[in-house]
Curated annotation (Swiss-Prot):
Alphabetized Gene3D superfamilies for the sequence: Ankyrin repeat-containing domain
ANK repeats: 29-58
Keywords of the record: ANK repeat, Early protein
PROSITE patterns to which the protein is assigned, alphabetical: ANK_REP_REGION, ANK_REPEAT
Note: This protein is homologous to the N-terminus of poxviridae interferon antagonist K1L. Presumably a premature stop codon mutated the gene in variola.
Alphabetical list of InterPro entries matching this protein: Ankyrin_rpt, Ankyrin_rpt-contain_sf
Regulation: induction: Expressed in the early phase of the viral replicative cycle.
Protein name: Truncated interferon antagonist OPG039
Gene expressing this chain: OPG040
Superkingdom: Viruses
Record family assignment: Belongs to the orthopoxvirus OPG039 family.
Amino acid sequence: MDLSRINTRKSKQLKSFLSSKDTFKADVHGHSALYYAIADNNMRLVCTLLNAGALKNLLENEFPLH
């Protein structure tokens, strides 16, 4: 699955994606939906993912803290 175009999905597609069990899994590039939402400055999607529990499911080393 390639999540790099998650910001172009329509709201109905996004709701379907958020209800799936693959929501917080990494894509073929090793990044999560939260990574792409932050990279594209899509604050609405970032907030939606955070409310859905993205912080509990962060991928190790995806967001290095330094």
